[in-house]
Amino acid sequence: METLNLPAGYRLERGLLWPADDRDCAALVFDTVPDMDHALKHCRQFELAVQAGGNMGVWALSLAAKFDRVVTFEPDPKNFRALVHNTSTAKNILSLPCALGNEAGTWCDLEREAGNAGAHQVTMGDIAPIVTLDGLNLPALDLLYLDIEGFEMMAILGALETIVRFKPVIAIEDKGLSDRYGYSQGQAEKFLATHGYEVVARPHRDVVMVCR
């Protein structure tokens, strides 16, 4: 049998390239893909979805089966290499090595939790650029799906013009990690409520909101 030559520091996880040192992330990622259905059933159109963090591409690949186009963001260089490899045959996925935030033009470092390729804390540095969704001038936005370890509020602030314009379905992870950045748990939800959004589902630690 032919042996697949993997890049150093990677393994295969359910057929996808994956960081070899990850212990905790893989099972959680695959187990939570069905949670997307709570958001998808509220989408009226399926032209464009934005998803962050991209991780190794599992969520982006799932969304690519539904949407015409998917834009995914992953600032961790090791994860991004796997993401690009795993999504290379999906021509409707655009992968960007950036963090979504509210201050375009700044750069960040990523403090990675040992054994968990999906757990990061953003600090100022020089590993990856921070961009705003508003700065991309997207032609549409039907779903905004954010799982970025407490950085969701900053991403929303940097996407507010786009959100107001297109009124996408929004799904965010909210497990209290926003405290790291000066925002309390539930603050992003309350902020979106002031712009006409209401909660329609709470799968696990996520909050799904739609604009009425």
Segments predicted by a language model, with ranges:
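Proline-aspartate-enriched helix->loop->beta-strand connector
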Residues: 168-172
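Glycine-rich adenosyl-binding loop in Rossmann-like folds that engage adenosine-containing cofactors
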Residues: 8, 12-37, 91-139
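Hydrophobic pocket-lining residues within nucleotide cofactor-binding pockets
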Residues: 54, 98-102, 148, 174
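S-adenosyl-L-methionine
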Residues: 1-89, 177, 185-191, 199-212
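Short, hinge-like loop/turn segments at secondary-structure boundaries
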Residues: 88-90, 110-116, 162-163, 187-191
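Hydrophobic packing residues within well-ordered alpha-helices of enzyme cores
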Residues: 63, 83, 109-110, 155-159
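Short internal loop-to-helix segment that lines adenine-nucleotide cofactor pockets
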Residues: 27-50, 116-166, 178-182
